[in-house]
Design a protein with these regions (language model features):
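N-terminal export/targeting and maturation segments
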Residues: 7-81
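Extracytoplasmic electrostatic interaction patches
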Residues: 83-172
Length: 172
């Protein structure tokens, strides 16, 4: 019995506790616990949308916490244009340096506004889907491709599994 209790405690000490949320309203309550980013690309929590899909999972592991946030917002045309304008003009400061998101049309399935691209195994970006007035906001931290909740099409072409050191391209 002591062995079972000890193995349970060791497992949770090493692999941490997983927190998962799938409810649309959970995005509005997101406080960024276990997230090592200001989540600059994500919209304000009070923004109205036509529809919303949200997934949040974090696991506080002993060596490297993992986190994935996926938010898909469909907007009216006017809301979509205002939100893409916000992304185009977004500036944020870090250590006396001001940066803007960069626009990437080559490495994503559509035009993306990127804040972080494989910076210490972290990715933060927003993909714009013009034909449906939809924006997909993504934050990934120390994630393996097989554990990611969203479609693999929404990953950048240069995505690397956590510490795997291999690109996920399928080209020979």
């Amino acid at each position: 019995m002591l062995g079972i209790i000890l193995s349970y405690v060791c497992y949770h000490f090493i692999y941490g506790t997983r927190i998962t949320s799938r409810e649309g309203e959970a995005y509005h309550k997101l406080e960024g616990k276990g997230v090592y980013s200001p989540l600059a690309v994500f919209p304000s929590a009070d923004m109205d949308t036509v529809s919303q899909d949200f997934y949040y999972q974090t696991r506080d592991e002993i060596f490297a916490a993992t986190c994935q946030i996926y938010l898909e917002n469909q907007y009216t045309r006017e809301q979509y244009e205002a939100e893409t304008e916000r992304l185009r003009n977004l500036k944020f400061s870090y250590q006396d340096q001001t940066n803007m998101l960069y626009q990437d049309e080559e490495n994503y399935c559509s035009v993306a506004y990127v804040a972080m691209a494989n910076w210490t195994d972290r990715y933060e970006y927003a993909i714009t889907l013009d034909d449906s007035n939809t924006i997909i906001y993504v934050y990934l931290q120390n994630m393996d491709a097989k554990d990611i909740h969203m479609q693999s099409d929404y990953l950048p072409k240069y995505f690397q599994d956590n510490n795997a050191g291999k690109h996920q391209d399928t080209d020979p």
